[in-house]
């Protein structure tokens, strides 16, 4: 069955795998999903990810990160801008949870965090928030 919102599918797969305490999860490949995975890796929310090319279609295998007591590094991950209600924010985007969490934006500079958007003076579509 085709997915109408690939970003929500990406978020849901990661959230569900974290709640089920899975070490890895497989996500259908797209360049956008690869860029979001790279950003989550850079910010320390996931352990690693690899792009696996199979005969039928490529996938992204995400290795989830857990603390010493077994809690997921991702406490909350929520879609903000949806197909029915797009959310855009300017270069003066506010901090999520006073800077403890991140907004992930799609801007003219690529997939960036709210902190990077403020530093570069750009805005964009707020894809999701993560804490």
UniProtKB/Swiss-Prot annotation:
Residues annotated as signal peptide: none
One GO cellular component, as annotated: ribonucleoprotein complex
GO molecular function list: rRNA binding; structural constituent of ribosome
Xref: PROSITE patterns: RIBOSOMAL_S8
Keyword rRNA-binding among UniProt keywords: yes
SUPFAM superfamilies: Ribosomal protein S8
Keywords, comma-separated and alphabetical: Ribonucleoprotein, Ribosomal protein, RNA-binding, rRNA-binding
A Pfam family assignment: Ribosomal_S8
GO biological process, one term: translation
Subunit: Part of the 30S ribosomal subunit. Contacts proteins S5 and S12.
Function field: One of the primary rRNA binding proteins, it binds directly to 16S rRNA central domain where it helps coordinate assembly of the platform of the 30S subunit.
Family affiliation: Belongs to the universal ribosomal protein uS8 family.
Protein's UniProt name: Small ribosomal subunit protein uS8
Lineage of producing organism: Bacteria, Pseudomonadati, Chlorobiota, Chlorobiia, Chlorobiales
Gene: rpsH
